[in-house]
């Protein structure tokens, strides 16, 4: 039975009692001029999405302010709702689906592995896990890998590794380094440790007290960071080479170099969070390669398995030597299925010419956006590297994002809500980028209507 059949049963699946959902904002979107909007094919089919959304309102916890769209299938850079309406996907599941949807090589690898072995615990060895670790080590600064299930879990592991490292390397100190440095506009996750490293106060405040000992500094402020690292007992500095959720801000080489030097001088670990910006998105395999500055620990997740849940913590031998049996663990992480999927993603990204094509398409797209949108009074800046692009506005980005949605284009917001974030599948074509730029241009008047 398909999901569409399930939600089309004549007999109600759930009680018919109406449940009001307070606090959930229902977005109102309107079509943009000169952009064709496909109409739902029938009243009957319209009901499928309606039934799904109504059922979700009854049974799901209201943690997401969802847009009123149900996505039921995808191919390449296109997504479709149950009514058959097509969307050009420049969100990629928030920088996850780097190979697009239903990539044939990825699908074959996952199907074959699922028919062979899906899950074993980490009490045992499995071939795909070891092979993936070997590939990650061979293509990075790292010597060893710890697998997790998500980006926030990867950062939680990095927190624990940093504290254990400080105790291991300085056993005679009565009070080893336990504090952390993070930066403005940072996002490192939503579990209690990684949440403590996330700068946005409204993410943290409902759950206070979170992990103590975190100091937030201005992103890019070399003097403040250097002084604090030298003065305090800092276990690790967490930094995103390119901030995605924070608004698509790129670090400077001088800033990352200064962090590296200050950490080396003080015995502090440097952690690069590349959960969103890593694995080819910038046109480099790792975002920090742009700057020629290397960390002690790097956390990965979103794109690694091409849509399946995975995270990874890459560490040097120096860090790994501090970690022993029982220091950390997880039931599901590094399973054969997700690791086989990740091997396929890595294989395709590392093919000759793939990363160069990402860089080329990213440059082409950014220049096109500057030319098409730069003259609009609401557009402050178009920035980014490769295929992580931000369009900063002087007003809320929501009206533009919503109008694009209604016109068949999926993009995201970021920063303080005034940045349009674009993180498409890395396989996107120049023609698809041109179409996206044209829709963005045609939808700009939505900013005036809601200004």
Curated annotation (Swiss-Prot):
The GO biological-process annotations, alphabetized, read as:
L-arginine biosynthetic process
User: Could you give one GO CC term from the UniProt record?
Assistant: chloroplast stroma
Query: Which reactions appear under catalytic activity for this entry?
Result: N(2)-acetyl-L-ornithine + 2-oxoglutarate = N-acetyl-L-glutamate 5-semialdehyde + L-glutamate
Query: Can you tell which superkingdom this protein's organism belongs to?
Result: Eukaryota
Record keywords: Amino-acid biosynthesis, Aminotransferase, Arginine biosynthesis, Mitochondrion, Pyridoxal phosphate, Transferase, Transit peptide
In terms of one coarse class, where is the protein primarily found? mitochondrion
List N6-(pyridoxal phosphate)lysine occurrences by residue.
Answer: 302
To which pathway does this protein belong?
Amino-acid biosynthesis; L-arginine biosynthesis; N(2)-acetyl-L-ornithine from L-glutamate: step 4/4
Output the PROSITE patterns linked to this UniProt entry. Answer: AA_TRANSFER_CLASS_3
UniProt-listed InterPro entries: AcOrn/SuccOrn_fam (IPR004636), Aminotrans_3 (IPR005814), Aminotrans_3_PPA_site (IPR049704), Class-III_PLP-dep_AT (IPR050103), PyrdxlP-dep_Trfase (IPR015424), PyrdxlP-dep_Trfase_major (IPR015421), PyrdxlP-dep_Trfase_small (IPR015422)
Tissue expression, per UniProt? Answer: Found at highest levels in nodules, confined to the infected cells.
User: Subcellular location, in the record's words?
Assistant: Mitochondrion
Q: HAMAP family from the xrefs? A: ArgD_aminotrans_3
Family statement: Belongs to the class-III pyridoxal-phosphate-dependent aminotransferase family.
User: NCBIfam families from the entry?
Assistant: argD, PRK01278.1
**Primary role:** Involved in the biosynthesis of citrulline.
Protein name in UniProt = Acetylornithine aminotransferase, mitochondrial
